[in-house]
């Protein structure tokens, strides 16, 4: 296989925003921002199996561990949709904060955490009841509340710690998952968006959209090691380690 070359294309709806991959079922689930739909794509046949209507500007997509249920955010609708992955239809909606963006699920399967960018909060959803069970607010030192625009979040495999990017506030929040208390803030670059952990969870990588760089953080000390210049307006980050 040639690296840095296009090896194929898959069908989606208009303006695909984010996606989730189910390797076992060979399905790709794509949020189409301008189409206000979720495309369920059969990878092997390269066809759209279902086109699921959603609220306006869908973005975040998450698959349940058993592959049967999808969760999709609608930024304009302030909604999280629960979708039947096989049947291709919305089962239930829950209202969250303003402009919901991304997800993380607790490893025990009990909770779904959702960033609400313009509310400056993370909403916690009880998956059994599919209802909001709490929310977490953020305010790093020296920042205005209006600067806090959370987008990305990631949890450690043991489910004990969550990291949340705070957008214009230029920090990453460290949250104790069980108590939902903020343990600290890490200064990063301008408009922190995407975030991921290294495989051994020793480092965090944060895309700074207005800084044109990626900040690498030592997870143990909770301090930035270096910020690496990249292309313009980096948005997401994936580590192949």
Please report, for each region that a protein language model flagged, where it lies by residue.
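Predominantly soluble domains enriched in secretory-pathway, periplasmic, or organellar proteins
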Residues: 1-241
């Amino acid at each position: 296989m040639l690296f840095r070359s296009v090896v194929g294309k898959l069908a989606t709806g208009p303006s695909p925003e984010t996606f989730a991959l189910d390797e076992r079922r060979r399905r790709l689930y794509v949020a189409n921002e301008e189409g206000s739909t979720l495309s369920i794509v059969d990878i092997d046949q390269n066809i759209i199996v279902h086109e699921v209507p959603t609220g306006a500007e869908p973005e975040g997509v998450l698959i349940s561990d058993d592959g049967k249920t999808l969760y999709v955010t609608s930024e304009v609708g302030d909604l999280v949709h629960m979708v039947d992955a096989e049947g291709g239809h919305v089962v239930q909606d829950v209202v969250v904060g303003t402009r919901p963006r991304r997800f993380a699920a607790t490893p025990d399967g009990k909770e779904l955490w959702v960033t609400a960018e313009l509310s400056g909060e993370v909403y916690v959803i009880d998956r059994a009841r599919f209802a909001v069970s709490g929310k977490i607010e953020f305010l790093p030192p020296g920042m205005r509340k209006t600067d806090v625009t959370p987008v990305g979040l990631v949890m450690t495999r043991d489910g004990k710690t969550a990291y949340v990017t705070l957008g214009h506030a230029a920090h990453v929040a460290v949250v104790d998952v069980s108590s939902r208390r903020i343990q600290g803030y890490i200064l990063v670059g301008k408009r922190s968006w995407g975030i991921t952990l290294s495989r051994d969870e020793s480092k965090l990588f944060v895309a700074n959209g207005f800084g044109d760089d990626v900040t690498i953080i030592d997870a143990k000390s909770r301090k930035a090691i270096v910020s690496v210049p990249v292309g313009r307006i980096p948005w997401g980050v994936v580590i192949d380690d």
